[in-house]
Amino acid sequence: MKKKIAEYEVGEQVDIFLLIKTATKGIASNGKPFLTVILQDPSGDIEAKLWDVSPEVEKQYVAETIVKVAGDILNYKGRIQLRVKQIRVANENEVTDISDFVEKAPVKKEDMVEKITQYIFEMRNPNIQRLTRHLLNKHQNEFLDYPAATKNHHEFVSGLAYHVVSMLDLAKAISNLYPSLDKDLLYAGVILHDLGKVIELSGPISTTYTLEGNLLGHISIMVNEIGKAADELQIDAEEVLILQHIVLSHHGKAEWGSPKPPLVKEAEILHYIDNLDAKMNMMDRALGRTKPGEYTERVFALDNRSFYKPSFHN
């Protein structure tokens, strides 16, 4: 079986079909234009530069284009890159479907839906349960397909649902340890906190921000969605306000994107759970591409650190 992009090591030659995830234009120090492209297959993605690009070439190499690339893998300032020697757009008879080139969550959608539904059934507060079920049903198709982000963590097909399932399991374990926590609020917060991303983001492949995403952001979007759901369900209770606060504050601080800090116990815990699961995903994926006794490439969202994989970890 042909190697995937994440399986290549520094110094190895590459001759492979990949999907352009993103393509960003820049101007080099010599004044000439270049493209920074993120290329992907189901194993992950890698950055590459296309130098001295003409307007015609720029139009060729856009997001969602499958290309045949030849080059070699290098480590540039702690980041793994693909140095391109040859590149061309793939012919129709060479490749089948874009979906063959995208990374997907390691759990089936049906299994994730079943697990999330079970957590909703465990809720005892009828207002919280009805609001959560209503909003999940409204956005379920997109929720099961979309990534949790454009980069950094869970940025793959069904990544949003996978992130939520992991967080729910964390929330359950923490609630069992600290029984004073309101499980209903915490579970609902986990399910709803990033649900606005189905409106903020463009879709599961070559994900970008929508107009609403750029102008409002997923936090504001979801606060409004909770308010609309409450009106539709004729729920006029404090639970609505608390759920809105939990979503509004889950980034923790204004400089991290939350207009208000957590002022409810469950909001504070949700912030930690979200942060923990995102960071674990980043570390696990970086370490999964690393041999024992070596360091990962730099992880930008974790203070640009390289993590060591102990030699006794196989």
Swiss-Prot record:
Shows a 3'-5' exoribonuclease activity. Its EC number is 3.1.-.-. Belongs to the YhaM family. It comes from Bacillus cereus (strain ATCC 14579 / DSM 31 / CCUG 7414 / JCM 2152 / NBRC 15305 / NCIMB 9373 / NCTC 2599 / NRRL B-3711). Residues 163-279 form the HD domain. The lineage of its organism: Bacteria, Bacillati, Bacillota, Bacilli, Bacillales. Keywords: DNA-binding, Exonuclease, Hydrolase, Nuclease. This is 3'-5' exoribonuclease YhaM. One of its GO terms (molecular function) is DNA binding.
